[in-house]
Amino acid sequence: MLEKIQETAAFLKGKMHTSPETAIILGTGLGSLANEITEKYEIKYEDIPNFPVSTVEGHSGKLIFGKLGNKEIMAMQGRFHYYEGYSMKEVTFPVRVMRELGIKTLFVSNASGGTNPEFEIGDLMIITDHINYFPEHPLRGKNIPYGPRFPDMSEAYDKELIRKADAIAAEKGIKVQHGIYIGTQGPTFETPAEYKLFHILGADAVGMSTVPEVIVANHCGIKVFGISVVTDLGVEGKIVEVSHEEVQKAADAAQPKMTTIMRELINRIDTSLS
C-alpha cells in the first residue's frame, strides 16, 4: 500500500509545477468550483497509476492544479464512493497521496439529506463533527506510518477554520448552519425510519461520503474543513421521493454560496495553520 502511494505521488510530482499545501474534494453538483481555478493544469484519474476511476454522474474524474485566488491548490473533481464497490483503502487512497505531496489542509464538500427539522433545502451546513456509520473502517489493517495506530478524533474538523468560515459567512450575508454529518454506505437514499434513527443518534445531515476521507486526513495530520449542502429533507412530514438528478439540481443552486465561502476561507489560511 505504502509503495503504491509513493509511486502515485512520484508520478504526480513529475507532472506538477506548483507546490500546493491546500486540497479540495469537490462533491455532488459542486464541481463547478473548478471554474474558479486559474493557471490550471489537469490530470485525468485514468492516467494516474493506482488511482480508482469515478463512476458517478456529476463526478468528472480528474485532479486539477492551479490557483484559487492567490493560493496554490489541488482539487479532486470527482470522488470515490464505497457504494461503487471500492474498498475503503481505495476510497481514501487520494488523501494519502495528498499527504505524500505535502498537503496540510483539506477542504471537503458534499450533498446531504437534512435530518434536523430546522434545516431547509439549499442550506449550507458547516460540519462540526461526524458519525461513522460505514461497515468498514478506512484504517483497518496494518497501520500506515503517516500517523498513530489509534488516532485522536476529538477535533476532526478544525475549529479555527470553522470560526473563520462563520466570520466570512456573516461578512457576506450567507446563512450557514452547523451540524453533525453521518456517513452511510449507500447507494440507497434513506428510508423515513432511517432518517428518524440518524436524527435520534445526533446527526443533522446524512450522506454517502466524506467521513472516510476525513478519518484518513486526521490520521495523516491534515487539518480538515467540511461543508455540506442540504439537498433533500429527511424530516417527518417533509420527506418526498428523491432522485440523484434532484440532488444535483439543489446542490447546483447552492453552489455560488459554497464557492464564496470556500474561496475566501482558502485565501485566509494562516501560514501557521497550513
Task: Describe the function of each predicted region.
Residues 11, 15, 160, 164-174, ...:
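Generic non-transmembrane alpha-helical segments
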Residues 143-181:
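Metal-dependent peptidase/peptidase-like ectodomains
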Residues 99-102, 199, 218:
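Non-catalytic positions within long, well-ordered alpha-helices that form the structural scaffold/packing
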Residues 104-105, 204, 223:
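Short acidic/polar active-site loop segments enriched in Thr and Asp
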